UniProtKB/Swiss-Prot annotation:
It holds the Pfam family XTBD. Plays a role in maintenance of steady-state concentration and turnover of microRNAs (miRNA) by degradation of mature miRNA in complex with the exoribonuclease xrn-2. Stabilizes and enhances the accumulation and activity of the exoribonuclease xrn-2, and thus contributes to miRNA turnover. XTBD domain is necessary for interaction with xrn-2. Disruption phenotype: At 26 degrees Celsius 80% of progeny arrest at the L1 stage of larval development. Reduced xrn-2 levels. This is Partner of xrn-2 protein 1. The lineage of its organism: Eukaryota, Metazoa, Ecdysozoa, Nematoda, Chromadorea. It comes from Caenorhabditis elegans.
Length: 335
């Protein structure tokens, strides 16, 4: 397949003729300069900036302006259009709105202010699909943070983790993709949040919810993203649970396979009694009050195995639904 045919295959059904002619010109001008996926992202950014007035970081905006300088569709174009080479484009001035055929500057401005969202949203949803594909190809021996950095860089997207006390919020470009308040006993809430975001991207269909400026996975609001991810991960270990040991060691192994480490928390109560909690990923799996005679190491080990057996049976019964519920040792609980 030749260069022109390869680029022509990139046209989307929803693209207007003007937008496509500009994007095609951009892709042809830089066809030999970038990998295909990166060029697709850059060409859409060029359209977002040129036609929709979208704003990004200063560095990215300058890069797009430089790459797009001098690129415009010929008003009297033939079917093949008129393009400039990348080497020439970099020496020319950026295309102005007045250079584009159709409505006047004023009418274009009004239209741009009133209805940029449908095309912009479709474009961003498409980029989320590319982010999913990029994450799937990222080596899994990397940490969650390294995986996100690698994937977002390849898709020319920015992501940021904002932590205030135990509340974690993650944004991708200008949209919130994750939000959760962890309990004070969660060992590494940042790592939990990033791993959850990766699992959600890889397991769900992501789409922008414009009214709330959220990226929702399978339509779930971002405040419920963590609970739904934990629910999915528990469902994923069902096969291993059905074929393995229903003990603390066995359950710990199954949970580790889906990035959920299990810990045992003990809390002293009145007298000699204690409360034993099994917690994973800030989810309270099981809780039991121990009498004074049960507070020895051998007895607690036996009871922990019994509690693990109960959790395994719960997983096998397909009745798991995890919800936000701030407990003494967790921020999630079974409904």
């Amino acid at each position: 397949m030749g260069k022109l045919e390869d680029v022509e295959a990139e046209k989307k059904l929803w693209e207007s003729d003007d937008a496509w002619e500009l994007r095609k010109a951009f892709m042809l001008a830089h066809y030999d300069d970038y990998p295909k996926i990166q060029l697709q992202c850059l060409s859409q950014l060029f359209i977002n900036v040129t036609l929709l007035g979208c704003e990004y970081s200063q560095t990215l905006m300058q890069k797009i302006r430089t790459m797009g300088a001098g690129i415009a569709a010929n008003k009297d174009r033939t079917k093949t259009g008129s393009y400039v080479k990348a080497s020439a484009a970099k020496k020319r001035q950026a295309v102005k709105t007045s250079d584009l055929e159709g409505a006047s500057d004023e009418s274009k401005k009004v239209k741009m202010e009133k209805s940029p969202s449908p095309v912009a949203r479709e474009s961003f949803d498409e980029r989320l699909g590319k982010l999913k594909a990029s994450l799937a190809m990222t080596p899994h021996h990397l940490t969650g943070e390294q995986m996100m950095k690698t994937a977002t860089n390849s898709c020319l997207m920015k992501w940021h983790v904002n932590k205030i006390n135990q509340k974690i919020e993650i944004t991708i470009d200008r949209y919130v993709a994750f939000r959760h308040t962890f309990s004070q006993y969660c060992v590494d809430p940042r790592d939990c949040a990033i791993n959850t975001l990766i699992e959600s991207i890889l397991s769900c269909d992501a789409a922008v919810h414009e009214e709330s400026y959220e990226i929702r996975f399978d339509g779930v609001p971002v405040d419920e993203c963590y609970a739904k991810s934990v629910t999915r991960r528990l469902a994923k270990i069902k096969s291993a649970v059905s074929n393995g040991a229903h003990t603390v060691k066995g359950l710990t192994t199954y949970l580790d396979a889906v990035n959920m480490s299990m810990i045992q928390n003990t809390q002293k109560l009145e007298g000699w009694s204690q409360q034993l909690d099994l917690v994973t990923a800030d989810l309270l799996l099981s809780s039991r009050v121990l009498s004074s005679t049960e507070c020895t190491k051998p007895a607690m080990a036996t009871i922990a195995n019994q509690m693990s057996e109960d959790v395994c049976q719960l997983i096998l019964n397909d009745k798991i639904n995890v919800i936000n519920s701030m407990k003494s040792h967790s921020s999630l609980a079974f409904q």
